[in-house]
Amino acid sequence: GLLEQGLSPGQAVGIMLPTSRDYFFSFFGILLAGGVPVPLYPPVRLSQIEDHLRRHAAILNNAGVSVLITLPEARPIAWILKSQVMSLQRIMSAQELLSAGGLRSRPPLNASDTAFLQYTSGSTGTPKGVVLTHDNLLSNIRAMGRAVDADSTDIFVSWLPLYHDMGLIGAWLGSLYFSGQLVLMSPLS
């Protein structure tokens, strides 16, 4: 997987995937390998491809992403991004990561280590990155849980994509932390 590709602890890895099992596996795979996930929205509209490339190139360059995990269908976009991002060395699918085998050793983590980088949409300018440490993330999840009195009997329902901070933190990681059930829906249904 990522360690075999030379991923160093704290190195940024982009995830350009829709909400799916592959997203779950990729996000935690990056964390377990000691990397830093960088969520990106996948391309959806050809009419907005130039804007997509501009925003994503800015994010990938700013984060220093070395590996980008994406759908096989999005590889042409990923290759264009690779030509615009000097740090980007490898483009992989989630299936390539899964077929690489298990993790032999796990780098140690501290509460102050970066859990992931969340970027703004960039709708009014260049996307800006927010560093979330493991401690920040857990504090945020606990605060949200206290506000709604969340526990393991709750069923979390979300249509928000996992590359969105509320979909990722509030829905998925929140339900995981509180051992609640998570039901994911398409925003189109």
Positions of the model-derived regions?
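Short hydrophobic alpha-helical segments of the AMP-binding
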Residues: S26-L31, P37, L60, L137, ...
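Conserved ATP-dependent adenylate/AMP-binding module captured primarily in the ANL superfamily
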Residues: P39-T70, P76-W79, A100-G101, N140-V157, ...
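Nucleotide 5′-phosphate-binding alpha/beta core
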Residues: E4, L31, R54-D113
